Amino acid sequence: MGLIYAEIELINGGDIELVRRGFMDKDEIKRMWVTALVDTGSYMLAINENIQEQLQLPVVEKRKAQLATGQIIECDVVAPVELRFKNRQTTCRAMVLPGDAEVLLGAIPLEDMDVLIHPLRQELIVNPEHPYFAQMKMK
């Protein structure tokens, strides 16, 4: 299987809450579309410093991360990030990789959105068994 990319929308989850509470107008929500590498070997969503800056996502902690090269680096973790793909969405934390690193869409947000990798078409798809809404087991 080759590399699989997906167009996803990233939104500042704090802005969504400010709109809900009436402190911000809906058109002020910081959001952007990005192309993410679908990476089932990564646990979390990983964004880069440029995206963090544009969305003004607050740092909630620091964590160590092991890169594909084996190198261990310390990264900021930002939250909340709302992530949208087709008719699916999830709210999650994101690791911030240095510079203009590639966005990685990891296993946890993939599972939460109930999306799958289609190996023949080499694309991310909505789970055909649950096409209208995400479904997960609670046992």
Segments (PLM) and residue ranges:
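Pepsin/retropepsin-fold aspartyl endopeptidases
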Residues: M1-K139
